[in-house]
Amino acid sequence: MAAEEHALTSTEYIKHHLTNLTYGKMPDGTWKLAENAKEAQEMGFSAIHLDSMGWSIGLGIIFCLVFWCAAKAAKADVPSKFQSAIEMIIEFVDSSVRDTFHGKSRLIAPLALTIFVWIFLMNLMDLIPVDWVPMLAQIVGAHVFGMDPHHVYFKIVPSTDPNITLGMSLSVFVLILFYSIREKGIGGFVGELALNPFNPSNPVAKALLIPVNLILELVTFLARPISLALRLFGNMYAGELIFILIALLPFWIQWALSVPWAIFHILVITLQAFIFMMLTIVYLSMASEKH
């Protein structure tokens, strides 16, 4: 349990572990690190979650370096275990793309690989004991920057931050729009929204049903990035919260509960990365289809 447990109640302990390291502009015009959730809220859209951004970028760099090293060390005759593992991941993603995406694009397979591995690495951070990195951040904040340890927040699981998951899903949404307009044209894209799901042969009925179709299709279309983001965020946030609740229990109970939950959570970590990747492929495949 965290070193500050004697000073914090259980509720404060949970809130502390679920609060991001936030930097932003205060209403008085000053830029600073938020010392509590209220200050972070006052920063509004100028607030930046430094921990989520830092870990996301860092894990992205690790992903690129690992695959770059694998490519540099690749051998055609006798592949190493490391090369074999990387090739298995690539072949798995490539087969998923070939089975699901029916359009023609060189972007989809690299995009799917990036999404799967990057989200998997972000989710994997949830297996690090909840107090280790925050305690280190408190020590650094107190001794290097002279900060109050109780005001040092540091989350290490980027996928438990809705800003990160929404950012990724909105990027996918932009690609969906791009492929839809590229393959169908603006007229075809608008027509697809206006003439589905109800498309009677009678011209009058067709015209009357256009507003209904637009409402239904726009809601469905706009719900895709939101559901994509919230599904990943919700599952990972719940998993992190359970680890935090386990950390509040006596030491001898923690191991009895945390180990089985961590083993089960490995499945959740992998499954959520896979679901995000597959839904991205499916949505882009639908956008690439010509009707």
Swiss-Prot record:
Lineage, top-rank taxon, reads Bacteria
- Which keywords does this chain's UniProt record carry? ATP synthesis, Cell inner membrane, Cell membrane, CF(0), Hydrogen ion transport, Ion transport, Membrane, Transmembrane, Transmembrane helix, Transport
- Entries under Pfam families matching the protein: ATP-synt_A (PF00119)
Give the membrane topology, semicolon-separated if more than one. Answer: Multi-pass membrane protein
**Gene Ontology biological process terms in this record:** proton motive force-driven plasma membrane ATP synthesis
Where is it located? Cell inner membrane
Q: Give the matching InterPro entries.
A: ATP_syn_F0_a_bact/chloroplast, ATP_synth_F0_asu, ATP_synth_F0_asu_AS, F0_ATP_A_sf
Q: What does this protein do?
A: Key component of the proton channel; it plays a direct role in the translocation of protons across the membrane.
Family label: Belongs to the ATPase A chain family.
Name of the protein this chain belongs to: ATP synthase subunit a
Q: Which organism is it from?
A: Acinetobacter baylyi (strain ATCC 33305 / BD413 / ADP1)
State the gene name recorded for this protein.
atpB
